[in-house]
Every structure is written in C-alpha cells, then in structure tokens.
Amino acid sequence: MLSLSKNWNALIKPNKVAYENFPETNNKAKIVVEPLERGFGLTLGNAMRRVLLSSLQGAAITSIKIPAIEHEFSSIPGVKEDVSEVILNIKGIEVKMHVAEKRIMKLKVTGPCVVTAGMIDTGHDVEILNPDHVICDLAKDKQLEMALTCKVGKGYVLSTNSYEDNLPIGEIAIDALFNPVKSVTYKVENTRVGQVTDYDKLIMFVETNGDLLPEMAVGLAARILQEQLQLFISFEEQEEDKQVKTDALPFSPYLLKRVDELELSVRSANCLKNDNIIYIGDLVKRTESDMLRTPNFGRKSLNEIKEILAKFNLRFGMDVPDWPPENIQELSKRYEDSYN
C-alpha cells in the first residue's frame, strides 16, 4: 500500500523564511520563502495576502462625542472643517491598545492651531501610532473638546454595521479599520534546487501600521490558515518504517547533507549559497579550479572546505553517479540520521 505520508514528504519544502526590513522603517519588510513546488508560490502568496488584509486583530476608534454636536452633518464653531470631514480624518488615526477592553480618549485644545492626533490624551493603555496625523484646523481663541472611544476588533466595520448598540445621544459611530496590516503585495520567481531551476520563490512585501511587526503579522496569518485547514485532515497517519537502508544508495549518504549545516565561515557559506550549491553532493562534483573561479571565493575558503570534506572521506572533483536524485529532499530527510 502506498504510504500516505509520501503525498507531503515527497514535496520540496522551504529551507527557511528570510526577513529583510527596510532601512527607513521597521514597519515594512520583504519576506522571501524558497524553494517551493511549482505553483505553490501563487497558492500560498494569495492565501497569505487575503488573511493578512482581513483577519488580524487590531485597534481602531469606533465612535466620537463632541459637545453640542448630535450628528455628522453639523459644523463645529471655530473649526474650518465640518463634522463629516473631521470624522474622515479621525478614521485615519492609527492606534495600538495594550488591553482588550474599550478605552475612551480625550481631546481638549484651544486655537489657533492645527489639531493633530498627538494632542489626544490616550492614557496608559492606548498609543497613537501616527501622532502627526491632522484632525482639523482650529481658529484663534476657539476650543475643541472631544471624546473618542477605542476598541479591539478585526477587519473593516462600517458605522452602519457597528456592534455599538444603543449609543448615547450625541455619540457618533464611525467606520473602523481594525486591521494592523496596511498593504501586502507578492510576486513569484523561479529558484534553483540542485540542477532543477523551475521551483518557486515567493517574495512578499508587507507593511503594517506599527501595531505589529511584519514578521509577527506573517506568523499570525500562517497560524490562522493552519487552524482553518486542520479540520480537513480526516485520516490517521501511518507508522513509517524508520529503518534506513543505506546500501540502497548509489553514493554516500553524506552527499545528502546540506552545506548550510556545515560549520563554515560566513564568507565561505555565502559563496556557496550565491553559486547555488545546496548539498555536499553539489559541492564535491566541482573541481578545485571550478571553486576558485567562484566570485569572492579564495584559497583560504577552499582549504577550509577541503578539511571538512576530508572528515567525511570526500574530496573535490568526485564522480557521483545518479546525482542529483529526483527526490533529493526526501532522501536527505530519510538519511539524516546516517550523516549526523
């Protein structure tokens, strides 16, 4: 009977997730995942993007109360903008809450001034993430008071669909954007494993409002997908025979060891990575002359690697039959105990 686990174990799996933050801010990151089976880059990228933009918990202002103002079609004495414009500006305020319960923030300023989000008294449990965001223009000797209710939620909730029931007279519900992720884009490129060059590389660009770091947002989105998909697994996994038959291989199992598991200097490791040398089998097929032609790879790096290969009774310039095997990642996992 065909092993059920072969359905997922035989597939190529990503080696790691690489995060690269942009120098101007920690709220933007480039995330690279490789290698993936062909088609999986688009599948995972689209699923992650949808979850990131719709399902993460965040905080937002859900209602406001301005003395003597009962609805959004009013005007505020001394304020250049009408109430609907002020509400639109308030929707752009990004907040972070350190508690799950709702909090009420206070705003009290006297003109003339440009009123910004940083002037709001948030207390200890709420943090304004964009304090320079403009709320309105206040005229000279005029005063503006406002109470702003902040809550935790997810997604985008219209004021007409607000879960705020029985708001007091004069308190105005506003549209609330809870999602801490501002934008997600992705693209899929080809990447190489051994001699095969048509695997997928998923590259995602994630920007948050500062409530979460992009790395955390991606991790939470992956966990949400994991929880949702778990229900579809409706079978019991079979016990696999853990006996590894090393004599079935036409080459040494040490060739299946990944070069990033070797204790190499950073310079040597980067040279191998840039030259797409993944496994020791890829490495020993190269000659010393081949290696010295690799950019930034010198005699010192060559001698370092020769010493490590000698520990496994291996050398450069070896003739390895049937390399690379089609199921190289599965073999590497199966024979892991043999070379560790």
Swiss-Prot record:
* Main EC class the enzyme belongs to: transferase
- Catalysed reactions, semicolon-separated: RNA(n) + a ribonucleoside 5'-triphosphate = RNA(n+1) + diphosphate
> SMART domains from the entry?
RPOLD
Task: Return the GO cellular component terms, semicolon-separated.
Answer: cytoplasm; DNA-directed RNA polymerase complex
State one molecular function term (GO): protein dimerization activity
Task: State the InterPro entries in the record.
Answer: DNA-dir_RNA_pol_insert, DNA-dir_RNA_pol_RpoA/D/Rpb3, DNA-dir_RpoA, RBP11-like, RNAP_asu_C, RNApol_insert_sf
Residue ranges for the region (Alpha C-terminal domain (alpha-CTD)) are 251-340
- Kindly state the subunit structure of this protein: Homodimer. The RNAP catalytic core consists of 2 alpha, 1 beta, 1 beta' and 1 omega subunit. When a sigma factor is associated with the core the holoenzyme is formed, which can initiate transcription.
Descriptive protein name: DNA-directed RNA polymerase subunit alpha
Taxonomic lineage? Bacteria, Pseudomonadati, Pseudomonadota, Alphaproteobacteria, Rickettsiales
